[in-house]
Every structure is written in C-alpha cells, then in structure tokens.
Curated annotation (Swiss-Prot):
Belongs to the CISD protein family. Gene3D superfamilies: CDGSH iron-sulfur domain, mitoNEET-type. The lineage of its organism: Eukaryota, Metazoa, Chordata, Craniata, Vertebrata. This is CDGSH iron-sulfur domain-containing protein 3, mitochondrial. [2Fe-2S] cluster 1 binds at residues 60, 62, 71, 75. It comes from Homo sapiens (Human). [2Fe-2S] cluster 2 binds at residues 98, 100, 109, 113. Its cofactor is [2Fe-2S] cluster. Monomer.
Length: 127
C-alpha cells in the first residue's frame, strides 16, 4: 500500500528536475531583462508641445514610441526594460521636450541634440 511517504520520495535518477522558480524567472527575464536596453535617438530636434497645468504626462525614455515625445507602450512590447518618465505640469505653457534622449534635464530639451555625438548618430540607433 502506498502512503503519503511515497509521494514525498525524491525523484528517480534521470527524471527531469523541474524547478518552478527557475521556470518562472526565465519567463520573466524575457519580458524584464536585467540589463535594460539603451535609449535610441527618436529625432534630432525637440518637439514643442503645450503642457496643461495639473495634467500628468508620460515622456518616452526608450525612444521607440511612435507618439514622440510621449510614451505609447513600445518599451514593453519591445522588451527594453525601460519605463516612461511620469511628470505633472505645474503650469500651462509651451515647452520643448527632448526627442534625442540625451538631455541632462529630462523630459525637457537642454540643447544636447546639437552635439556632434547626437548629430552623427542615426535616428533609431542608441547613443
């Protein structure tokens, strides 16, 4: 008669060792890589937009969005490991938002797109 002890015995040699934790982590690694992809140059000029006071925006960090300078979720579907920069406008005004993704003041343009490094880069390539 087989009792509860039979169920708890170690697997026979040669049997496939299933590790649910490893299986889950390898699945997660496909969608959330440990080393995020680098941002790519979306455009080499900033985009001027009117931000409305109190409204929350999501600025594209990865450079892959088709709705530049804002996020459309491309970072998730292309498995970049990057996330958009969420910010709230303090006042209604026109601003230049960076699309080269090299700014030191994200999401705002700081003129870095004029640098030789950005101008030599191809649109869609990482810096």
């Amino acid at each position: 008669m087989r009792g509860a002890g039979a169920i708890l015995r170690p697997a026979a040699r040669g049997a496939r060792d299933l590790n649910p934790r490893r299986d889950i982590s390898s699945w997660l690694a496909q969608w959330f890589p440990r080393t995020p992809a680098r941002s790519v140059v979306a455009l080499k000029t900033p985009i001027k937009v009117e931000l409305v006071a109190g409204k929350t925006y999501r600025w594209c960090v990865c450079g892959r969005s088709k709705k530049q300078p804002f996020c459309d979720g491309s970072h998730f579907f292309q498995r970049t490991g990057l996330s958009p920069l969420k910010f709230k406008a303090q006042e209604t005004r026109m601003v230049a938002l960076c699309t080269c993704k090299a700014t030191q003041r994200p999401p705002y343009c700081d003129g870095t797109h004029r640098s030789e490094r950005v101008q030599k880069a191809e649109v869609g390539s990482p810096l």
